[in-house]
Amino acid sequence: MALIQHGSVSGTSAVRLSFSSSVSPPSSSPPLSRVSLNFQSEKKSCYRRMICRAMVQDSVQGIPSVYAREMERLSAKESLILAFNDAGGFEALVTGKITDMQKIDVNERITNLERLNPTPRPTTSPYLEGRWSFEWFGVNTPGSLAVRVMFERFPSTLVSLSNMEIFIKDNNTKATANIKLLNSIENKITLSSKLTIEGPLRMKEEYLEGLLESPTVIEEAVPDQLRGLLGQATTTLQQLPEPIKDTLANGLRIPLGGTYQRFFMISYLDDEILIVRDTAGVPEVLTRVETSSPMSSSSVVENLEYNS
Protein backbone atom coordinates (compact mmCIF):
# COMPACT_ATOMS: atom_id res chain seq x y z
CA MET A 1 0.00 0.00 0.00
CA ALA A 2 2.96 2.34 0.59
CA LEU A 3 3.97 1.89 -3.06
CA ILE A 4 0.49 2.86 -4.15
CA GLN A 5 0.43 6.01 -2.03
CA HIS A 6 3.78 7.28 -3.35
CA GLY A 7 2.73 6.50 -6.92
CA SER A 8 5.85 4.53 -7.81
CA VAL A 9 4.02 1.54 -9.27
CA SER A 10 0.40 0.55 -9.86
CA GLY A 11 -1.66 -1.28 -7.24
CA THR A 12 -1.69 -4.53 -9.23
CA SER A 13 2.08 -4.43 -9.82
CA ALA A 14 2.72 -3.84 -6.14
CA VAL A 15 0.72 -6.89 -5.19
CA ARG A 16 2.40 -9.05 -7.81
CA LEU A 17 5.89 -7.94 -6.80
CA SER A 18 5.32 -8.49 -3.11
CA PHE A 19 4.06 -12.04 -3.47
CA SER A 20 5.74 -13.34 -6.64
CA SER A 21 9.20 -12.72 -5.21
CA SER A 22 8.39 -14.90 -2.21
CA VAL A 23 7.89 -18.03 -4.35
CA SER A 24 11.15 -19.76 -5.32
CA PRO A 25 11.34 -21.82 -8.55
CA PRO A 26 10.90 -25.55 -7.99
CA SER A 27 13.84 -27.95 -8.39
CA SER A 28 14.21 -30.04 -11.55
CA SER A 29 12.94 -33.34 -10.07
CA PRO A 30 11.27 -32.80 -6.71
CA PRO A 31 9.76 -35.70 -4.73
CA LEU A 32 6.00 -36.20 -4.97
CA SER A 33 5.43 -35.05 -1.40
CA ARG A 34 7.42 -31.88 -2.03
CA VAL A 35 5.42 -31.11 -5.17
CA SER A 36 2.23 -31.45 -3.16
CA LEU A 37 3.49 -29.00 -0.53
CA ASN A 38 4.60 -26.50 -3.14
CA PHE A 39 1.20 -26.74 -4.84
CA GLN A 40 -0.56 -25.88 -1.59
CA SER A 41 1.83 -22.99 -1.04
CA GLU A 42 1.24 -21.63 -4.53
CA LYS A 43 -2.53 -22.04 -4.05
CA LYS A 44 -2.40 -20.02 -0.83
CA SER A 45 -0.21 -17.44 -2.52
CA CYS A 46 -2.76 -17.18 -5.32
CA TYR A 47 -5.51 -16.58 -2.77
CA ARG A 48 -3.40 -13.89 -1.15
CA ARG A 49 -2.89 -12.21 -4.52
CA MET A 50 -6.63 -12.25 -5.22
CA ILE A 51 -7.51 -10.81 -1.79
CA CYS A 52 -4.90 -8.07 -1.94
CA ARG A 53 -5.84 -7.17 -5.52
CA ALA A 54 -9.48 -6.84 -4.44
CA MET A 55 -8.44 -4.65 -1.51
CA VAL A 56 -6.47 -2.38 -3.83
CA GLN A 57 -9.35 -2.11 -6.27
CA ASP A 58 -11.81 -1.31 -3.46
CA SER A 59 -9.55 1.40 -2.08
CA VAL A 60 -9.13 2.99 -5.49
CA GLN A 61 -12.77 2.70 -6.57
CA GLY A 62 -14.30 3.47 -3.14
CA ILE A 63 -13.17 7.10 -2.89
CA PRO A 64 -14.76 8.24 -6.18
CA SER A 65 -17.99 6.43 -5.32
CA VAL A 66 -18.19 8.13 -1.91
CA TYR A 67 -17.71 11.60 -3.36
CA ALA A 68 -20.07 10.86 -6.23
CA ARG A 69 -22.70 10.10 -3.59
CA GLU A 70 -21.82 13.33 -1.81
CA MET A 71 -22.25 15.33 -5.02
CA GLU A 72 -25.62 13.64 -5.53
CA ARG A 73 -26.65 14.69 -2.00
CA LEU A 74 -25.66 18.31 -2.54
CA SER A 75 -27.58 18.36 -5.82
CA ALA A 76 -30.67 16.94 -4.07
CA LYS A 77 -30.44 19.67 -1.40
CA GLU A 78 -30.27 22.40 -4.00
CA SER A 79 -33.19 20.86 -5.88
CA LEU A 80 -35.33 20.85 -2.71
CA ILE A 81 -34.57 24.49 -1.91
CA LEU A 82 -35.45 25.49 -5.48
CA ALA A 83 -38.75 23.62 -5.14
CA PHE A 84 -39.54 25.63 -1.98
CA ASN A 85 -38.85 28.89 -3.79
CA ASP A 86 -40.86 27.89 -6.86
CA ALA A 87 -43.83 27.04 -4.62
CA GLY A 88 -43.80 30.49 -3.03
CA GLY A 89 -41.88 29.76 0.15
CA PHE A 90 -43.12 29.98 3.72
CA GLU A 91 -45.68 32.71 3.03
CA ALA A 92 -47.45 30.66 0.36
CA LEU A 93 -47.43 27.63 2.65
CA VAL A 94 -49.11 29.34 5.63
CA THR A 95 -51.69 31.13 3.48
CA GLY A 96 -52.63 27.98 1.57
CA LYS A 97 -51.59 29.29 -1.85
CA ILE A 98 -49.56 26.20 -2.81
CA THR A 99 -51.07 23.96 -5.48
CA ASP A 100 -51.31 20.18 -5.32
CA MET A 101 -48.73 19.91 -8.11
CA GLN A 102 -46.26 21.98 -6.09
CA LYS A 103 -46.94 19.90 -2.97
CA ILE A 104 -46.23 16.59 -4.71
CA ASP A 105 -43.11 18.07 -6.32
CA VAL A 106 -41.74 19.18 -2.94
CA ASN A 107 -42.57 15.83 -1.33
CA GLU A 108 -40.82 13.95 -4.13
CA ARG A 109 -37.65 15.98 -3.62
CA ILE A 110 -37.87 15.48 0.14
CA THR A 111 -37.88 11.71 -0.43
CA ASN A 112 -34.92 11.95 -2.80
CA LEU A 113 -32.88 13.79 -0.18
CA GLU A 114 -33.87 11.51 2.71
CA ARG A 115 -32.36 8.43 1.04
CA LEU A 116 -28.98 10.25 1.02
CA ASN A 117 -29.01 11.01 4.76
CA PRO A 118 -25.34 11.40 5.82
CA THR A 119 -25.99 11.10 9.57
CA PRO A 120 -26.65 7.50 10.72
CA ARG A 121 -27.60 8.47 14.31
CA PRO A 122 -29.20 11.92 14.11
CA THR A 123 -30.81 11.86 17.58
CA THR A 124 -27.36 12.00 19.22
CA SER A 125 -25.64 14.10 16.56
CA PRO A 126 -24.28 17.55 17.54
CA TYR A 127 -25.77 18.89 14.30
CA LEU A 128 -29.24 18.60 15.83
CA GLU A 129 -28.61 21.49 18.21
CA GLY A 130 -29.00 25.08 17.09
CA ARG A 131 -31.62 27.42 15.70
CA TRP A 132 -33.81 26.13 12.86
CA SER A 133 -36.42 27.82 10.68
CA PHE A 134 -39.51 25.98 9.42
CA GLU A 135 -39.68 25.80 5.63
CA TRP A 136 -42.30 23.08 5.16
CA PHE A 137 -44.83 21.32 7.37
CA GLY A 138 -47.81 19.08 6.78
CA VAL A 139 -51.43 19.06 7.84
CA ASN A 140 -51.22 17.56 11.33
CA THR A 141 -47.97 19.06 12.58
CA PRO A 142 -47.85 21.58 15.49
CA GLY A 143 -46.90 24.32 13.05
CA SER A 144 -49.91 23.75 10.82
CA LEU A 145 -52.27 23.54 13.82
CA ALA A 146 -51.09 26.91 15.10
CA VAL A 147 -51.53 28.45 11.66
CA ARG A 148 -54.99 26.92 11.27
CA VAL A 149 -56.21 28.24 14.64
CA MET A 150 -54.87 31.69 13.91
CA PHE A 151 -56.36 32.06 10.44
CA GLU A 152 -59.71 30.62 11.52
CA ARG A 153 -60.08 33.53 13.95
CA PHE A 154 -58.50 36.31 11.92
CA PRO A 155 -58.55 36.93 8.16
CA SER A 156 -55.21 36.93 6.40
CA THR A 157 -55.61 40.66 5.69
CA LEU A 158 -55.44 41.40 9.42
CA VAL A 159 -52.92 38.88 10.68
CA SER A 160 -49.79 37.36 9.17
CA LEU A 161 -47.27 34.79 10.30
CA SER A 162 -43.82 35.99 9.28
CA ASN A 163 -41.79 32.96 10.33
CA MET A 164 -41.52 30.03 12.74
CA GLU A 165 -38.29 28.98 14.40
CA ILE A 166 -37.19 26.37 16.91
CA PHE A 167 -34.10 26.38 19.12
CA ILE A 168 -32.73 23.00 20.26
CA LYS A 169 -30.21 22.70 23.08
CA ASP A 170 -29.53 19.86 25.55
CA ASN A 171 -32.71 17.99 24.53
CA ASN A 172 -34.85 21.06 25.25
CA THR A 173 -36.64 23.04 22.56
CA LYS A 174 -38.22 26.45 22.28
CA ALA A 175 -40.44 27.02 19.22
CA THR A 176 -41.35 30.61 18.37
CA ALA A 177 -43.98 31.94 15.97
CA ASN A 178 -43.75 35.61 15.01
CA ILE A 179 -47.18 37.11 14.35
CA LYS A 180 -48.03 40.57 13.03
CA LEU A 181 -51.48 42.17 13.43
CA LEU A 182 -52.56 44.97 11.09
CA ASN A 183 -48.95 45.13 9.94
CA SER A 184 -48.20 47.23 13.03
CA ILE A 185 -48.46 45.04 16.14
CA GLU A 186 -45.86 42.31 16.53
CA ASN A 187 -46.35 39.41 18.90
CA LYS A 188 -44.53 36.19 19.70
CA ILE A 189 -45.93 32.85 20.77
CA THR A 190 -43.38 30.51 22.32
CA LEU A 191 -43.81 26.80 23.03
CA SER A 192 -41.26 25.03 25.25
CA SER A 193 -40.83 21.27 25.14
CA LYS A 194 -38.53 18.47 26.21
CA LEU A 195 -37.02 15.85 23.90
CA THR A 196 -36.38 12.24 24.87
CA ILE A 197 -34.24 9.96 22.72
CA GLU A 198 -36.10 6.77 21.84
CA GLY A 199 -33.58 5.34 19.37
CA PRO A 200 -31.05 6.30 16.66
CA LEU A 201 -33.81 7.99 14.62
CA ARG A 202 -36.82 8.31 16.94
CA MET A 203 -37.57 10.95 19.59
CA LYS A 204 -40.44 11.91 21.88
CA GLU A 205 -41.45 15.54 22.39
CA GLU A 206 -43.34 16.63 25.52
CA TYR A 207 -44.77 20.16 25.60
CA LEU A 208 -44.06 21.93 28.89
CA GLU A 209 -45.20 25.55 28.62
CA GLY A 210 -46.73 28.07 26.25
CA LEU A 211 -45.91 31.78 26.42
CA LEU A 212 -47.80 34.64 24.81
CA GLU A 213 -45.39 37.55 24.95
CA SER A 214 -46.44 41.15 25.38
CA PRO A 215 -47.09 42.73 21.96
CA THR A 216 -44.79 45.33 20.47
CA VAL A 217 -46.44 48.23 18.65
CA ILE A 218 -44.77 49.81 15.63
CA GLU A 219 -46.29 53.28 16.00
CA GLU A 220 -45.25 54.61 12.60
CA ALA A 221 -47.02 51.64 10.95
CA VAL A 222 -50.33 52.07 12.81
CA PRO A 223 -53.14 53.21 10.46
CA ASP A 224 -54.46 56.72 11.13
CA GLN A 225 -57.95 55.45 11.96
CA LEU A 226 -56.53 53.29 14.76
CA ARG A 227 -54.20 55.79 16.40
CA GLY A 228 -56.96 57.03 18.70
CA LEU A 229 -57.79 53.52 19.85
CA LEU A 230 -54.12 52.82 20.43
CA GLY A 231 -53.81 55.88 22.64
CA GLN A 232 -56.84 54.86 24.68
CA ALA A 233 -55.51 51.32 25.11
CA THR A 234 -52.15 52.65 26.27
CA THR A 235 -53.81 54.90 28.85
CA THR A 236 -55.96 52.03 30.12
CA LEU A 237 -52.95 49.76 30.55
CA GLN A 238 -51.11 52.40 32.55
CA GLN A 239 -54.03 52.57 35.01
CA LEU A 240 -54.02 48.84 35.75
CA PRO A 241 -52.67 47.54 39.09
CA GLU A 242 -48.97 46.80 39.19
CA PRO A 243 -49.30 42.98 39.44
CA ILE A 244 -51.44 42.92 36.29
CA LYS A 245 -49.07 45.25 34.45
CA ASP A 246 -46.14 43.03 35.42
CA THR A 247 -48.00 39.98 34.15
CA LEU A 248 -48.74 41.66 30.83
CA ALA A 249 -45.17 42.90 30.54
CA ASN A 250 -43.71 39.45 31.17
CA GLY A 251 -46.23 37.69 28.95
CA LEU A 252 -49.00 35.21 29.60
CA ARG A 253 -47.65 31.80 30.56
CA ILE A 254 -49.72 28.67 30.00
CA PRO A 255 -48.38 25.60 31.87
CA LEU A 256 -48.83 22.39 29.92
CA GLY A 257 -47.06 20.00 32.29
CA GLY A 258 -46.31 17.39 29.66
CA THR A 259 -50.02 16.96 28.89
CA TYR A 260 -49.36 17.00 25.15
CA GLN A 261 -46.69 14.91 23.48
CA ARG A 262 -45.82 13.46 20.12
CA PHE A 263 -43.34 11.03 18.57
CA PHE A 264 -41.31 11.80 15.48
CA MET A 265 -38.46 10.35 13.44
CA ILE A 266 -35.49 12.25 12.05
CA SER A 267 -35.17 11.08 8.46
CA TYR A 268 -32.42 13.51 7.39
CA LEU A 269 -29.86 15.70 9.16
CA ASP A 270 -26.78 17.61 8.13
CA ASP A 271 -25.34 21.01 9.05
CA GLU A 272 -27.96 22.88 6.99
CA ILE A 273 -31.18 20.86 6.70
CA LEU A 274 -33.30 18.89 9.18
CA ILE A 275 -36.21 16.66 8.08
CA VAL A 276 -38.52 14.95 10.58
CA ARG A 277 -41.63 12.82 10.08
CA ASP A 278 -44.46 12.31 12.55
CA THR A 279 -46.29 9.06 13.26
CA ALA A 280 -48.42 9.57 10.14
CA GLY A 281 -45.31 10.02 8.00
CA VAL A 282 -45.94 13.73 7.35
CA PRO A 283 -42.63 15.59 6.82
CA GLU A 284 -41.37 18.81 8.34
CA VAL A 285 -38.38 20.51 6.71
CA LEU A 286 -36.25 23.02 8.59
CA THR A 287 -33.17 24.98 7.58
CA ARG A 288 -30.49 26.16 9.96
CA VAL A 289 -30.58 29.82 10.91
CA GLU A 290 -27.28 29.98 12.75
CA THR A 291 -24.47 28.71 10.58
CA SER A 292 -22.21 26.05 12.05
CA SER A 293 -18.84 24.71 11.00
CA PRO A 294 -19.12 22.69 7.78
CA MET A 295 -18.70 18.95 7.82
CA SER A 296 -15.14 17.88 7.19
CA SER A 297 -14.42 15.63 4.24
CA SER A 298 -13.34 12.84 6.59
CA SER A 299 -16.67 12.89 8.43
CA VAL A 300 -18.52 12.87 5.11
CA VAL A 301 -16.58 9.81 3.99
CA GLU A 302 -17.14 8.09 7.33
CA ASN A 303 -20.89 8.68 7.33
CA LEU A 304 -21.38 7.71 3.71
CA GLU A 305 -19.32 4.55 4.12
CA TYR A 306 -21.48 3.66 7.14
CA ASN A 307 -24.62 3.90 5.01
CA SER A 308 -23.16 2.09 1.99
Swiss-Prot record:
The keyword Metal-binding does not apply. It is found in: Plastid, Chloroplast, Plastoglobule. InterPro entries: PAP, PAP/fibrillin_dom. Pfam families: PAP_fibrillin. It comes from the Eukaryota. The keyword Zinc-finger does not apply. Keywords: Chloroplast, Plastid, Transit peptide. Its main location: plastid. One of its GO terms (cellular component) is chloroplast thylakoid membrane. Residues 1-55 form a transit peptide. Belongs to the PAP/fibrillin family. This is Probable plastid-lipid-associated protein 9, chloroplastic. The gene is PAP9.
